[in-house]
Amino acid sequence: MDPSPLSISIAIFSLLISFLLYKKLTTKLPPGPKPWPVVGNLYDIKPVRFRCFAEWAQTYGPIMSVWFGTTLNIVVSSSELAKEVLKEKDQILADRPRNRAAARFSRDGKDLIWADYGPHYVKVRKVCNLELFSPKRLEGLRPIREDEVTAMVESIFRECTQQDKIGNSLVVRNHLSGVAFSNITRLAFGKRFVNSEGVMDEQGLEFKAIVANGLKLGASLSLGEYVTWLKWMFPFDEEAVAKHGARRDRLTRAIMEEHSLARKESGARQHFVDALLTLQEKYDLSEDTIIGLLWDMITAGMDTTVISVEWAMAELVKHPRVQEKVQEELDRVIGVDRIMTESDFPNLPYLHCVVKEALRLHPPTPLMLPHKASANTKIGGYDIPKGAVVHVNVWAIARDPNSWKNPLEFRPERFQEESIDIKGNDFRVLPFGAGRRVCPGAQLGINLVQSMLGHLLHHFKWELPEGMKPEEIDMTENPGMVTFMHTPLQAVAIPRLPSHLYKRMAVDM
């Protein structure tokens, strides 16, 4: 007698259940909070995720399982486990998880940030390391950075010396944002969209609108991104994303065309768009990859610079002893008859320690961009299945009392007492990541943060608004992938150099 369809179905179902039970019993996942059906731990996670995960690590340990819907996420919160993820198991854990928005924006990983590890990633990484962020190119673009930093100084001086504003506090972030915006658009596109009066041109307004719209679309994630079989209930707004992509590409192509014509007339310049167009044939770079790389640099470099400097300034206003010590070093090395340049950096070790300490306590990306397991592996003795998403809690690691003495104290001297690298070689402090995914623009970021901070402290003394106490500064973070201060820092800027040293050192390049 032939088996009936019902008996075949029952047999298949029984085998499936047996397999799933066997897999569950033999797979040793890291501990973690108990997930709810369908949604996992999504509704247990507090808005500031890295703080929430640090709290959970106190209960479940330095490696834990957190379920985003039906997707397993592994969160590590110790330097030892970070080393295992980013060095010892680096190749297996070097892929990127892409939600639907990231997949569309990156053309399914044709850029650098969202590319899986493979031949394409290796190629574009080589372009970044050898060409875009080479010491020679960074030095060639230095005049742009120094131009924009001195423009910031000029704008602060103009505001704080107005007759009706002397002694008033200013919103520090407003002045930092202008530097970051113009610096990154000039480095990437060779475009300063803002004139000397602060008026933005039409192309600049379009650029800002594209950036804002991209952030809005990227943040609008639905439950369907975390529960694969619910995607049909949460349709992706393909039309809105397609319009955004077309708008972004239209602006970028127009700028690329301008540079292509200029190259024919006067040769290539140092900007990233010129470099990529020049290298397009040598490295077989598609137009999608060139556009993707340009926007990777913009999204990675704009907010993170502002965040890093604002947090550093908050700590320096809160700790006047440290501020005075930096200013003593600046006065000793530079004096009061000229302004600082990047060539002064080797003679300003304490300033560099302040930058390191600020990045330790306030990494701009506190949860490293997620990695994905390309095969089954183990971390800390636990099973990590293929497809699991792995997060490194950089913020928690940098505040771990097992790695740092008095970890919550802002004390730059700790970097004088011990030589500690912050570009991926010391797993206790990882503001730029490490391993195959380490940020290729780390040195550029450090240079700009150090330059901005040095000029702010050399040109001005910074104080709290009248009547405000240091402990009243809001040192909490906004939710999000990057850590803006929840309340923008306000401080009083008091000029400390001769007035002729507050002029912008403009360059045309």
Swiss-Prot record:
PROSITE patterns: CYTOCHROME_P450. Keywords: Alkaloid metabolism, Heme, Iron, Membrane, Metal-binding, Monooxygenase, Oxidoreductase, Transmembrane, Transmembrane helix. Pathway: Alkaloid biosynthesis. The keyword Membrane applies. It is found in: Membrane. PANTHER family: CYTOCHROME P450 98A9. Cytochrome P450 which catalyzes 3'-hydroxylation of p-coumaric esters of shikimic/quinic acids to form lignin monomers and caffeic acid. Involved in the biosynthesis of phenylpropanoids and Amaryllidaceae alkaloids, including haemanthamine- and crinamine-type alkaloids, promising anticancer agents. Belongs to the cytochrome P450 family. This is p-coumarate 3-hydroxylase. The lineage of its organism: Eukaryota, Viridiplantae, Streptophyta, Embryophyta, Tracheophyta.
